[in-house]
C-alpha cells in the first residue's frame, strides 16, 4: 500500500467515495456468510454538513461515486464557489446500496467540529488532536 492508502480513516471523504462501507458488507458476506438485511450499522460522531465545506474537486469525486438523483441530498454549492458536503447521508446511501435495512442503521447527529470541546475534530484542531475509533463486531 502507498502512504495515502495507509492513512486509514484520516481522509474521511475518501472512504465514502471509495464506499468502504459497501466493501465491508461484501467482505462480511464472503467471509462470514452475513446477510446484509441482518447487519446492524452505525456511524458515530463526525463532521456535519454545516461544518464540512469542501472544494469542487472533492465534489467531483462524489459526482462520480453517487447517482445524480442523490446529489441534492449529499451536497450544495455556496455563493463562494465552495460546497457543503453531507457525509452522514453518504454513509446512509452506501449502507442502503449494500442491502442494509434503513431500520438497522443508526447515524448520529453529533458533529465533532460543533462539539470539539469533548470530541476530537480535525476541522477544529488540525493535526494536533487525537483520534476517534471505529469498530466492527460479529455476534
Cite the ranges covered by each PLM segment:
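Active-site microenvironment for binding and transforming phosphate-containing groups
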Residues: 1, 11-139
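Glycine-rich phosphate/oxyanion-binding loops and their immediately adjacent helices
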Residues: 6-9
